[in-house]
Amino acid sequence: MSNPDRSRVIRLAEAQASLPANERSVQVWQRGSLDVAFALPVPPKQQAPHSQDEIYIILRGRGMLVHDGRRDSFDSGDILFVAAGIEHRFEDVTEDLALWRVFYGPHGGDVAPVGTSS
């Protein structure tokens, strides 16, 4: 018998089907500090800085991520990273934008050791 806390497949179709009416995101899995949601962001919306590091995995659509004094374009298949405490928002996005939003790590962010480029 499998243990869903040890391994799991999260299906896009199931996440989309579980999205509550009139909602733009739904949590699909949580384990320890890991928190995964399916989201259909509506810009322009300034995101409040989060207490954990955050990854966006772009499933479809494209747009701009405004973060840390920068504007970076993104497209489906891209992965975006925003460190804990950084203000950010999406702009100029296509109507079909859909993504996985992943929070992880300790509150305050996961700090790379000094001397590394990660």
Regions of interest found by a model, annotated:
Residues 36-38, 65-67, 99:
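Short hydrophobic/aromatic-rich beta-strand segments that constitute the beta-sheet cores
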Residues 50-65:
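Short, conserved beta-strand element in jelly-roll/cupin
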Residues 1-48, 115-118:
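A short, N-terminal "cap"/entry segment at the start of jelly-roll beta-barrel domains
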Residues 69-84:
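Short acidic-glycine-tyrosine-enriched beta hairpin
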Residues 84-110:
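Ligand-binding loop in jelly-roll beta-barrel domains
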Residues 32, 66-70, 93:
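Short strand-coil-strand connectors
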